[in-house]
């Protein structure tokens, strides 16, 4: 059956649209010395749709947490466009930014550090409602108790303190608090890396269930591709502030085309795809300083396949084999189906 344009299902508006995002920090070198400039994020673009998860992966220092701080409105990008619900954050007024902050919430790596140890769980959950709404105390308590149940905790937990819970339970509380204002986007910065493996699976399943039930979008920051495999729909691989490969998870995991992505996947037990390395790839060379990144490809100092062109010419992020990749040699890694 053919459907006319009028009968077609409407396309949902993206929760987040980022175009050429940059974040540059001014680094003081002391008296009488000119300041250095550290480019933590260099022209990164991506989109996050409702009900979908974009995982941002890479080593420490790659810029993924800086990206999370920009999307969560903790920092303002130096340049580029960042649209939340169609509103450009960079150009937004203070009043608009205040309203946008309700639509984006954070879940941190260490749940114990993000929960006030002197307050009961009920008070912690009610706090966002007390600050941002005009609900009375009874309504706030009802919503907080309902949220506890939604994340799998019991009614008696309402009057307990954070130190009385396990790490997994504390992360459930942190997730519940993030959901109190009914956000469209959750920015999860390494939300399970501090938990035992068995507890990680429970929290990941909870996040997946909440996404399906509430239509949430996730920006999921992680260095663990084993975790990303279970939670993500799309993947953005970063290195030294640059996006070097991005696309659908199933496409990239089955056949990574950037040598850095190949090395990350090869170092993760249990991930096997058509293009996955048969043995671990050992990266040689030093991780460059972000204050003085290499010319040409940012990965050229550690790449096992480097050629002369890699040192002199920076590869653009281009469409290839169902994803975007920034590598001069990417075609040689494509394997026949």
Please name every model-derived segment.
Residues 187, 191-195, 199-278:
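P-loop NTP-binding/switch modules centered on Walker-like glycine-rich loops
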Residues 161-165, 169:
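Conserved ABC ATPase signature
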Residues 80-88:
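Conserved ABC transporter NBD signature motif
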Residues 4, 12-14, 28-32, 248-337:
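Charged, flexible cofactor/metal-binding loops and thiol motifs
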Residues 30-35, 89-105, 123, 131, ...:
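ABC ATPase NBD coupling module
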Residues 180-184:
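A short, proline-enriched helix->beta-strand linker immediately N-terminal to the Walker B motif
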Residues 87-88, 138-156, 265-266:
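Conserved ABC ATPase "signature" region
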């Amino acid at each position: 059956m053919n459907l006319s344009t009028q009968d077609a299902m409407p396309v949902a508006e993206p929760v987040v649209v980022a175009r050429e995002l940059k974040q540059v920090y001014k680094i003081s070198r002391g008296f009488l010395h000119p300041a250095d400039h550290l480019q933590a994020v260099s022209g990164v673009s991506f989109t996050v749709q409702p009900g979908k998860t974009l995982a941002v992966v890479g080593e420490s220092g790659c810029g993924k947490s800086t990206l999370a701080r920009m999307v969560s409105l903790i920092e303002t990008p130096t340049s580029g466009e960042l649209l939340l619900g169609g509103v450009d954050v960079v150009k937004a007024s203070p009043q608009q930014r205040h309203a946008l902050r309700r639509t984006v919430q954070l879940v941190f790596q260490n749940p114990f550090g993000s929960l006030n140890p002197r307050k009961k769980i009920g008070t912690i959950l009610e706090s966002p409602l007390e600050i941002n709404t005009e609900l009375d105390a009874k309504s706030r308590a009802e919503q907080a108790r309902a949220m506890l149940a939604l994340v799998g905790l019991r009614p008696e937990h309402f009057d307990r303190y954070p130190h009385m819970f396990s790490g997994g339970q504390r992360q459930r509380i942190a997730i519940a608090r993030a959901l109190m204002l009914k956000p469209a986007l959750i920015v999860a910065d390494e939300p399970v890396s501090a938990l035992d493996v068995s507890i990680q699976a429970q929290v990941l399943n909870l996040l997946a269930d909440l996404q399906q039930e509430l239509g949430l979008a996730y920006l999921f920051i992680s260095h663990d591709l084993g975790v990303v495999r279970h939670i993500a729909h799309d993947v953005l691989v970063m290195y030294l502030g640059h996006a070097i490969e991005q696309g659908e998870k199933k496409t990239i995991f089955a056949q990574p085309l950037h040598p850095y992505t190949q090395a990350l996947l090869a170092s993760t037990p249990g991930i096997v795809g058509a293009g996955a390395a048969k043995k671990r790839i050992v990266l040689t060379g030093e991780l460059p300083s972000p204050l003085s990144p290499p010319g040409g490809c940012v990965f050229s100092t550690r790449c096992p396949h480097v050629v002369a062109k890699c040192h002199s010419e920076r590869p653009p992020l281009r469409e290839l084999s169902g994803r975007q990749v920034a590598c001069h040699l990417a075609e040689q890694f494509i394997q026949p189906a």
